[in-house]
Amino acid sequence: MEALTSTIEERTKLRWDDNNWKHLPKRWGHSFHPMCSYLAMFPPGIPRYFIEQFTEPGDIVLDPFSGRGTAPLEACVSGRVGIGIDLSPLAHILTAAKVDPPSLNSVLKRIDELRIGYKRPNVDDVPDDIRMLFDGRLTLPQIVYLRNELSHRKRVDRFLLASLAGILHGGYNDAMNNSSYLSISMPNTFSMSPNY
C-alpha cells in the first residue's frame, strides 16, 4: 500500500500546471467521439490527460458514469483497457459501440440486409409526442423499422444504433439550412418526459 501511495504522490506532482488538454482543438481526438451528443459531456483531452498521468499501457480504466464513452474510448486509444458503466441505455450503446466497434464490412453488410429487408411498418400506434418530431411519410416509418430490427445485444447493431442516435439527436444545419439530422432541433430544456 505504501508503494501505491508513493506512486500516486509522485504522479500528482507531474506538471499539473501543464494542462495541455485546455489547448487542444475542439474537434480533437478519435473520430468516434462526436458520434452522438450527450449532456454533461467533456472534451476527450481531459480523460486522455489523466489516463496518461495515472495509468500505464495495459492498465484497466473504469469509468463508472461513462455517458457517451469518452473516457473508455480514450483509454483504449491510449493502449489501456477501457470499461464504462452507466444506467442509461443510450450511454451503454454509445460506450459499447466505441470500445468494441465492428468491422466496416460487417456494418455495410448489415445496412444492406436492412435495406433489402425493408417493409414499411404501421406507424399508427406511435404516440403523437413522438410523431411530431419526424416526417411521417418517410423518416418515422424508417425509424420504427430500425427500432424493430436492431438489437442492442449485437455488436454491429449497437454500432448502428449509436450512429443513428447521433443522427437523430443532432442540431446542426449548414449555411443552406440543409440538415444531416432526422429530427427537429430541440434545446436541452425540452424534455420528452410526460408531465415535464
Model-based region annotation:
Residues 3-57, 77-78, 83-196:
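Nucleic-acid modification enzymes, centered on SAM-dependent nucleic-acid methyltransferases
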Residues 58-67:
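Conserved class I S-adenosyl-L-methionine
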Residues 69-73:
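Glycine-rich SAM-binding Motif I of class I
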